[in-house]
Amino acid sequence: MAECPTDLINEMFLRLRATTLVKCRVLSKPCFSLIDSPEFVSSHLRRRLETGEHLMILLRGPRLLRTVELDSPENVSDIPHPLQAGGFTEVFGSFNGVIGLCNSPVDLAIFNPSTRKIHRLPIEPIDFPERDITREYVFYGLGYDSVGDDFKVVRIVQCKLKEGKKKFPCPVEVKVFSLKKNSWKRVCLMFEFQILWISYYYHLLPRRGYGVVVNNHLHWILPRRQGVIAFNAIIKYDLASDDIGVLSFPQELYIEDNMDIGVLDGCVCLMCYDEYSHVDVWVLKEYEDYKSWTKLYRVPKPESVESVEFIRPLICSKDRSKILLEINNAANLMWFDLESQSLTTAGIECDSSFTADILVSSLVLGCKGDPTQAQRSKDQKMMPKSTKRWDGFLSKGFKLKL
């Protein structure tokens, strides 16, 4: 390796998938330093995003994670949930190769399936302001703040009153975790936004509580309850400034009975559907321009499903002629041909307990390791200097790692 030019090694490594690079770290100290350097990690991720190389479909089960290579569906890898605690583990977001995991509102982690690195978030209790209030729905969001170079997890708790109690509106708690600071903070929510979370008006399906990231903002949809005089709403959270606002969308969609939010080709998209007939897909082509909302296409209900309860676009094909859709669950992954307006199965087998997402093969840890390990390292540094003499029996170039 010493005779091979550094630039050539760097270029070769940039072409490899993250799982291979993890193994290459042990080749030599220079390889270890190169692969772990922030500059290389950023360059590797940038190449993946620009070329679409080594993209994977992440199949998310209650007890198992499974990755399937998009270009080679026969290449499958199973990954046990690192947060296993006897119950079901949710995956509430995926960004730049990092995913958010949740066993409960106080048991969360950030995990990179390619490097198997995990960062468990410090426990943050839900602070109910009054005894008569209890938890109802919990919204989550995982995003990367490109301004502050920081991964963040947003937890929004929608509260409700205990039976027989009256109060308007019910409080909403918003807390944000910063990976850089490894700490939580509370974000104040203005009254006009608290009203939007009144449980009487809105009903949340579990997966609608996971935020989607576009333009350095996390977004959640608040679908109105059928039969209630209310409008659909889209909440947005600025990952850099902590500002919470509302994203505008066409008025004709205000009273849609079935609507979901997603990301298509880097743009916010809305799926409005007649569960027994079709799904209309709308896209906000220019984030700052409300008038750029466009109805792109109508997807017919596939014959293989009785009704459409949930639909989400995952990714465009490389030639941009097709879009991969998840319909109801990962057992119904289908390619939608934009020209013929037809659906064909993606040929990826799994049962209906799995849901799907797109995963980038990256070295972005989005995590600094397990906090318990970090604490052990911190304690080690605080040990008396006399303990360092035990390194003396090791060969030159080695260190004793406790």
Swiss-Prot record:
Domain (F-box): residue spans on this chain: 1-49
InterPro entries referenced in this protein's UniProt entry, alphabetically: F-box-assoc_interact_dom (IPR017451), SCF_F-box_component (IPR050796)
Superkingdom of origin: Eukaryota
Protein known as: F-box protein At4g22390
Organism: Arabidopsis thaliana (Mouse-ear cress)
Taxonomic lineage of the native organism: Eukaryota, Viridiplantae, Streptophyta, Embryophyta, Tracheophyta
